[in-house]
Amino acid sequence: MFRLYFFFNVICIFLAIRSAIGGEVPDATEQKINNFLASGKDSEDLSKRAAAMWFGPRLGKRTIASELHDEMMDEIDDNPLYYSGESPQRVASEIAQGTPYVVLLLTGRVLRQPQPVFYHSTTPRLGRRDASSSNENNSRPPFAPRLGRNLPFSPRLGRSFGAPVVDNFAY
């Protein structure tokens, strides 16, 4: 294992020395500028490209074209999030066709109402309460018990009637 690392390091050092002696290799930006100059296009366009390459990519929120956005939203609204393929019953019947024996796992039907299907465009508005929760009493009790204490509030700070009075403290 040591020999492998040794030969790898020797090869890396050899390549580093060879590239240093061989001359400076232009980076990709310089090559692009040289190719652009050789093509003979406007120098004004070259300065715009060079500035864009110098400052890097544009940061911030990129907007989608309105037509593309509308098409995407229509496609999302047409397909509910829960299931968008063939019905499971149809797929099962196609699989079971032509087989002599089929094992079916049946589940009981749930007697509750089916849940409404939510689409992508219906999102809850955070920070808003619906009308059903506005009728609830959200006020605190007069004294909130802390650390599991269920005793009523006593403003006397630990003193109570009938407790022994401590006058002498042992240090």
From Swiss-Prot:
Entry GO CC: extracellular region
Organism encoding this protein: Aedes aegypti (Yellowfever mosquito)
Modified residues (Leucine amide): L59, L126, L147, L157
Entry keyword annotation includes Secreted: yes
Range of residues in the leader sequence: 1-22
Chief location bin: secreted
Keywords: Amidation, Cleavage on pair of basic residues, Hormone, Neuropeptide, Secreted, Signal
Propeptide residues per the UniProt entry: 23-47, 63-111, 160-171
Protein's name according to its UniProt entry: PBAN-type neuropeptides
Region (Disordered): 120-151
Annotated function: A hormone that controls sex pheromone production in females and pheromone responsiveness in male. Also mediates visceral muscle contractile activity (myotropic activity).
Family label: Belongs to the pyrokinin family.
GO molecular function: myostimulatory hormone activity; neuropeptide hormone activity
Cross-referenced PROSITE patterns: PYROKININ (PS00539)
Keyword Transcription annotated: no
